Amino acid sequence: MNNYETVFILNPVLSDEQIKETVKKYEDFLVSKGAEMVAKEDWGLRKLAYAIQHKKSGFYHLFEYKAPGDAIEPLELEFRREERMMRYLTVKLDKHAIAWAEKRRKRNKEKA
């Protein structure tokens, strides 16, 4: 199993309930594909660097997880089909990125 991090941006016109429903849908999808969730972060509504689909902001979310390599392609296919999804990016984490992510989680936990 490899370590991955996925950041996705949801449409800013969604209600809180729709956002929670969408995030839960993709978390469940990953778990059904054999992934183990390491961390989830809700970065909230943020301004975009440039307009996407005529929108200037979006709700950012981050998933960090361990998954088999064949789980990523179906996830990204589902992202492409989702109307609520504006953008997404999945990266495979190397040992340095894993260490940095652990530091980030620890720092965020201390702030909370």
Swiss-Prot record:
Gene3D superfamilies in the cross-refs:
3.30.70.60
Member of which family?
Answer: Belongs to the bacterial ribosomal protein bS6 family.
Record InterPro entries:
Ribosomal_bS6 (IPR000529), Ribosomal_bS6_sf (IPR035980), Ribosomal_S6_plastid/chlpt (IPR020814), Transl_elong_EF1B/ribsomal_bS6 (IPR014717)
GO molecular-function term, one example from the UniProt record: small ribosomal subunit rRNA binding
Name this polypeptide is given: Small ribosomal subunit protein bS6
- One Gene Ontology cellular component annotation? ribosome
Q: Name one GO biological process term.
A: translation
User: Function of this protein?
Assistant: Binds together with bS18 to 16S ribosomal RNA.
Alphabetical list of PANTHER family matching this protein: MITOCHONDRIAL 28S RIBOSOMAL PROTEIN S6, SMALL RIBOSOMAL SUBUNIT PROTEIN BS6M
Query: Is Endoplasmic reticulum tagged as a keyword?
Result: no
Provide the alphabetized UniProt keywords.
Ribonucleoprotein, Ribosomal protein, RNA-binding, rRNA-binding
